[in-house]
């Protein structure tokens, strides 16, 4: 596909969800970026303009953002990597778009740090940028996602560094913004480079199980469809395999091998109204035996990032457990796209009350005293388990840390929540199949680390 064909694809994507977009300015932004990036090349050998085109495609296809966001995505590297200036961009488009481009450029300049205080300052800068215009971080996360998708062209050291940074900064922020689809892909791509052996084992085993599970999901979906149709409930049912990092984390939290984990797939039922959600829950519990302690009502008590759904885990008729998530169409869009969906509703005049769902940003910015500990707690809570996976040199107290020099797959360890690894000995079982039990010794004074 030529670069002009890529741009035509972008135009068609935008036209599908926003036929009133300013296509003249979008094309002018593309031509400006193409001219200024000129013969610049990526590590893959492709013309550099393919990258902003891909980022704009993500912004449009995944997030359905407005014309200004598309323009800014196309131009997001011109101030940083060419001789174009803020004034040039403002004259071409508008001061608002120039502000977005400058905001993304500022985030690009943030250097990855291994010291906790430096890392917290970097996170705070990102939060400050978010508080000014949420579109800055949405474009930046899209930028990082495309870079992770093309990470195979980087050196092994760069792959690990960027994957650590993605796992520590971008995936958690995507989670806090409710952008689950992008969070999952960021996590999976990071895991691919942080633990390539573990990632490949999970993917290969999932591929081997896929025909069996596809058939099982098809039968189960037919059962749910039939019963809901009989009840006269308008609905859509989606079935999916769980993503690799979710399974990887479950293996550690439950101290199991992949062969010992059975709930590898889940269903979503999307309906029109909240009352339908609870009616569907009753139908599901009538069809399948619910597993005690596995029901959560996130409709009555939404998550801090605005996520709403009913969650239940049931035992299937064939003896295999699976999760069912039940939500309305609007809840589904917010669950998939997070703050991007909220922002779109706000633009359409439907956003009353959504600002409060992101009060955590302002709260952290306004209350600097103690904010570090609060943000650390927010990060830790992302994992929702009593054990934390760490991929790096040390795990600071209370933080799900992925920092420091990454020194190979055997450096992967699990730590109990709130425990420092300084002068500690942690016994753990590497949960991937056919691996032996190991212990990690950290000797801080002599800066020696041994994997036994």
What are these regions (language model features)?
Residues 1-20, 34-40, 49-62, 66, ...:
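Nucleic-acid processing machinery
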Residues 14-29, 86-96:
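Short, mixed-charge amphipathic alpha-helical segments
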Residues 76-81, 85-103, 179:
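Hydrophobic or amphipathic alpha-helical targeting/insertion segments
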Residues 139-142:
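Hydrophobic transmembrane helix module of multi-pass membrane transport proteins
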Residues 440:
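P-loop/Walker A NTP-binding region and its immediately flanking N-terminal helices
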Residues 447-451:
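Short, intrinsically disordered C-terminal tails of secreted or membrane-associated proteins
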């Amino acid at each position: 596909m030529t670069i002009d064909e890529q741009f035509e694809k972008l135009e068609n994507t935008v036209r599908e969800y926003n036929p009133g977009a300013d296509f003249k300015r979008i094309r002018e932004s593309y031509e400006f970026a193409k001219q200024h990036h000129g013969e610049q090349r990526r590590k893959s050998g492709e013309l550099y303009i393919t990258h902003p085109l891909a980022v704009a495609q993500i912004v449009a296809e995944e997030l359905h953002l407005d014309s200004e966001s598309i323009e800014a995505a196309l131009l997001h590297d011109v101030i940083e990597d060419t001789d174009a200036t803020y004034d040039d961009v403002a004259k071409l488009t508008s001061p608002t778009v120039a502000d977005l481009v400058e905001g993304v450029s500022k985030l690009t300049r943030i250097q990855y740090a291994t010291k906790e205080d430096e890392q917290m300052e970097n996170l705070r800068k990102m939060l400050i940028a978010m508080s000014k215009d949420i579109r800055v971080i949405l474009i930046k996360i899209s930028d990082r996602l495309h870079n992770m998708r093309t990470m195979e062209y980087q050196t092994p050291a760069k792959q690990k560094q960027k994957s650590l940074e993605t796992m520590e900064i971008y995936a958690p922020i995507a989670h806090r913004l409710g952008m689950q689809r992008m969070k999952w892909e960021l996590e999976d791509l990071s895991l691919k480079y942080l633990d390539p052996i573990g990632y490949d084992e999970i993917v290969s085993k999932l591929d081997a199980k896929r025909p069996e599970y596809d058939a099982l999901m098809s039968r189960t979906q037919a059962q749910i469809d039939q019963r809901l149709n009989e009840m006269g409930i308008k609905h859509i049912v989606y079935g999916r395999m769980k993503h690799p990092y979710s399974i990887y984390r479950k293996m550690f939290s439950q101290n199991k091998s992949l062969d010992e984990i059975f709930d590898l797939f889940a269903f979503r039922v999307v309906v029109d109204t909240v009352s339908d959600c609870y009616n569907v829950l009753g139908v599901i519990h009538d069809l399948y035996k619910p597993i005690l302690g596995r029901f959560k009502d996130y409709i009555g008590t939404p998550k801090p990032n605005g996520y709403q759904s009913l969650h239940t885990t049931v035992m299937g008729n064939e003896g295999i457990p699976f999760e069912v998530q039940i939500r309305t169409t609007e809840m589904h869009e917010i669950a998939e796209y997070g703050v991007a969906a909220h922002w779109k509703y706000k633009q359409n005049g439907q956003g009353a009350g959504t600002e409060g769902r992101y009060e955590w940003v302002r709260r952290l910015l306004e209350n600097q005293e103690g904010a570090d500990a609060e943000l650390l707690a927010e990060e830790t809570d992302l994992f929702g388990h009593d054990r934390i996976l760490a991929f790096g040199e040390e795990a600071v107290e209370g933080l799900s840390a992925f920092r420091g020099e990454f020194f190979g797959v055997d450096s992967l360890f699990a730590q109990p929540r709130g425990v420092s690894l300084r002068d500690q000995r942690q016994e753990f079982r590497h949960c991937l199949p056919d691996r032996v039990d190991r212990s990690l010794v950290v000797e801080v004074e002599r800066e020696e680390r041994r994997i036994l």
